[in-house]
From Swiss-Prot:
Assigned protein family: Belongs to the orthopoxvirus mRNA-capping enzyme regulatory subunit family.
Name of the molecule in the record: mRNA-capping enzyme regulatory subunit OPG124
Gene: OPG124
Source organism phylogeny: Viruses, Varidnaviria, Bamfordvirae, Nucleocytoviricota, Pokkesviricetes
Keywords: mRNA capping, mRNA processing, Transcription, Transcription regulation, Transcription termination, Virion
Entry annotated with the keyword Ribonucleoprotein: no
Gene3D superfamilies named among the record's database cross-references: Poxvirus mRNA capping enzyme, small subunit
Amino acid sequence: MDEIVKNIREGTHVLLPFYETLPELNLSLGKSPLPSLEYGANYFLQISRVNDLNRMPTDMLKLFTHDIMLPESDLDKVYEILKINSVKYYGRSTKADAVVADLSARNKLFKRERDAIKSNNHLTENNLYISDYKMLTFDVFRPLFDFVNEKYCIIKLPTLFGRGVIDTMRIYCSLFKNVRLLKCVSDSWLKDSAIMVASDVCKKNLDLFMSHVKSVTKSSSWKDVNSVQFSILNNPVDTEFINKFLEFSNRVYEALYYVHSLLYSSMTSDSKSIENKHQRRLVKLLL
């Protein structure tokens, strides 16, 4: 428990290994790989609590998270730490210290207003911006279309769950020699988003990767039609890399399970009020 609280209050990170050789690429747009236990068993424990919250009416979610949904300022904090003075979003600037893509639903918890759902059997969709592997789209590679000689490539990932995000990180670990994943204190600890910071580009591998992508998309520039789910590797990445990734993501999901459990206990407490011991513990933890 102490380790969970420490990660929430101080953040957590991991340095991923560099691979000189790209994995065999086979880009296919339109569908994500399905989840499996191999890519994170903790998710399947954590998703049970997410489903509990997903069944709650959204007006109640808003009430109980109003004071703990602080503005997500993790990207700004990363810019400050790395002394990044200018960033390039989707080609909007010709010169910058970093090229950036934010795939997260910044400062949002749910997708649409909704009443309560009777039971998990009646759940047909994930209405929360939490643990949704379908949120990872091919936009995660969009900065590479704009990358010239920037020092950093920075991605705000919408989720850490599923094969897609692990395959994506494995590719980035051949495109750049230094790749870190960070879950900052100033990110939302209600959501499984995180930041990738990549630097020291491997030009040879980047050229090979972009050649494959451009041949599949039949375009040398980014097209919005490519903003869809995708799969990119036929073969699973090596177990060593998966375990290194899970070393980081498991810390995040353990913390989220604790936070979500407190929130659910607060929302279902006998007091029928936001003034209860679970909510007080939650506020103390996150503020």
